[in-house]
Regions:
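Conserved SAM-binding strand-loop segment of SAM-dependent methyltransferases
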Residues: 3-19
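Short, well-ordered beta-strand core segments
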Residues: 7, 27, 52-53
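Structured catalytic core of nucleotide-sugar glycosyltransferases
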Residues: 14, 23-26, 42
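Active-site micro-motifs of SAM-dependent methyltransferase domains
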Residues: 14, 34, 62
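Structural alpha-helical scaffold elements that stabilize or flank donor/cofactor-binding regions
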Residues: 19-20, 46
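Alpha-helix C-terminal capping/helix-to-coil transition sites in glycosyltransferase folds
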Residues: 22-23, 49
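A short SAM/SAH-binding and catalytic strip from SAM-dependent methyltransferases
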Residues: 25-39, 57
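S-adenosyl-L-methionine-dependent methyltransferase catalytic module, highlighting the catalytic core
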Residues: 40-45, 52-139
Length: 139
């Protein structure tokens, strides 16, 4: 703890049962969700222990991913996705729109969504142009 900020680092797939309801003001899942096995259960637990959460995820709907897969016929490799299909930690490949729909179907409120391309926020064609999405969510 420094300056009133508590940070906990743990195996998130091991469960968050050590923490009570609303134990944290904010839980951050940075580039994590796509690498977990039980996505829905994890999001439920994160929103149980946190009053809100920030989730960042890569956009597998980005035009370059579509191009590499559609034209090149291979799973994409890039600076943001530097792994081959056989050694990637990612087990879920989703788009920004997929996460929007997931939240709507599960009764999760998206308080704010920012879509980034080249480090800048964009609004035009976010599911095609966005490289990364940042969602602030709550129940």
């Amino acid at each position: 703890q420094q300056r009133g900020l508590n940070i906990v680092q743990a195996d998130i797939e091991g469960g968050l049962n050590l923490f009570g309801d609303a134990a944290f003001d904010l839980v951050i899942l940075s580039q994590t969700l796509q690498a977990t096995r039980h996505t829905e259960a994890l999001v439920n637990e994160v929103l149980r222990v946190g009053k809100s959460a920030i989730v960042t995820l890569p956009n597998f709907g980005h035009w370059s991913v579509r191009w590499q897969l559609g034209v090149g016929g291979r799973m994409p490799v890039s600076k943001r996705l530097p792994y081959q299909w056989y050694d990637t930690p990612n087990v879920h490949f989703s788009t920004i729109r997929d996460f929007d729909v997931f939240c709507a179907e599960k009764g999760i409120t998206v308080e704010r969504r920012a879509v980034l391309a080249g480090g800048r926020e964009i609004s035009l064609l976010p599911n095609v142009r966005g490289e990364t999405a940042v969602f602030q969510i709550r129940r």
